[in-house]
Each structure stands twice: as structure tokens, then as C-alpha cells.
């Protein structure tokens, strides 16, 4: 886990590196995978992100907690990190993705002047909470935005930037845009 934390700190200092959330997995974490384990084309990109599994001693229902779909909404990211570090599942399984839109954490929110990094002190020591843009970074997207966003269902939104909004792209496509590939991977996980 120490290597994982080092990579997370390093990623903020390198424009080319992917964002990896600063997480200190608690004793309830039974496994860790990556989103690319469910859709291999994401491996090595700024769209790959860690997934944590917390399994109970007894079989039961499975719950999925996703944080960081919109990196400028700090609450879900914080809730996901708190769950990974503190939850203990007795029955069933909890799957946690703390920072689904890893690309969005790599850039400042384009509509506010809120700092990207918020330093806090807690019981486990000093750490950082991150804040980014709600959309995939244009540099990661790899092309200019189209004139409008057209969902795979045919629904149209006049704001072209919505194509880079992960939440608008479910259920995703294996061969679609980056946002569609991220949501496809989540659906494969489910």
C-alpha cells in the first residue's frame, strides 16, 4: 500500500501521469483491482482508476459506491475514501470506486477558482482532498468537442462539453468515446 500512496503523490507533480486517489485502505479491504481489469483499453490511460472490494464473512447483497464522477463534487469522493479506510462488511460485498473520473482530477474546475488540493489534518495524519473539473480533461479527450452531444440513445444536448461528462454516457460502449468506455467498464464490473 505504500507504493500506491507514493504513486498518488507523484501523479500530482507530473502532467503526464494519471491521477491516483490518496487512499489508505483499511482492514476491511479484501482486494483491489483497476477499472482496466474490466475494459483493458483503459490500461495505461488517464481513465484507469482503482477499485476496492470489501467482502463480508457471509454471502449477501452487493453494493457499489462511486465517488468522483464529477471531481468538483467533493462529497462523494470523500465518502468513498472514508468507506475504504473505515468500513467493515459483515455480510455481502461493498465495491468502491473513489475517483471514477480520474481525468477530471487532473485539471482545475474550469467554472470556479476553487483550488485543486485541500490540505486537511485528521486522526491518521495530514492528507489532501482533491477537487477538479466535472468533465474529462480536453487534453485526455484527444479531440475538440463536437457541436453538440448526442447520446448513444439518440438524445441530444446542445452543450458539446456534456460528451465529456461521464454521468451522461451510461451504459457505455466498448468502442465508444473515452467517457463511454469508462461507463462501459463500470457496467462490466456490475
Predicted regions mapped to residue ranges:
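Short beta-strand-to-loop junctions in surface cap/lid or active-site-entrance loops
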Residues: 50-59
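Histidine-centered catalytic micro-motifs
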Residues: 64-72
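Alpha/beta-hydrolase fold active-site loops
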Residues: 61-64, 94
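Histidine-anchored nucleotide/phosphate-binding helix
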Residues: 80-85
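Short N-terminal binding/cap micro-motifs at the start of the first secondary-structure element
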Residues: 60, 72-75
Amino acid at each position: 500500500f505504500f507504493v500506491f500512496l507514493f504513486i498518488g503523490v507523484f501523479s500530482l507533480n507530473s502532467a503526464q501521469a494519471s491521477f491516483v486517489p490518496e487512499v489508505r485502505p483499511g482492514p476491511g479491504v479484501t482486494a483491489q483491482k483497476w477499472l482496466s481489469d474490466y475494459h483493458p483499453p483503459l490500461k495505461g490511460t488517464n481513465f484507469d482508476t482503482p477499485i476496492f472490494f470489501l467482502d463480508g464473512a457471509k454471502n449477501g447483497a452487493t453494493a457499489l459506491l462511486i465517488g468522483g464522477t464529477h471531481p468538483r463534487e467533493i462529497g462523494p469522493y470523500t465518502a468513498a475514501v472514508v468507506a475504504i479506510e473505515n468500513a467493515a462488511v459483515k455480510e455481502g460485498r461493498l465495491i468502491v470506486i473513489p475517483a471514477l473520473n480520474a481525468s477530471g482530477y487532473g485539471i482545475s474546475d474550469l467554472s470556479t477558482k476553487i483550488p485543486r488540493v485541500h490540505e486537511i489534518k485528521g486522526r491518521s495524519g495530514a492528507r489532501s482532498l482533491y477537487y477538479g473539473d466535472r468533465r474529462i480533461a480536453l487534453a485526455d479527450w484527444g479531440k475538440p468537442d463536437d457541436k453538440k452531444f448526442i447520446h448513444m440513445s439518440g438524445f441530444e444536448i446542445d452543450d458539446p462539453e456534456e460528451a465529456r461528462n461521464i454521468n451522461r454516457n451510461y451504459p457505455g460502449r466498448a468502442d465508444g468515446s473515452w467517457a463511454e468506455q469508462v461507463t462501459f467498464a463500470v457496467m462490466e464490473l456490475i
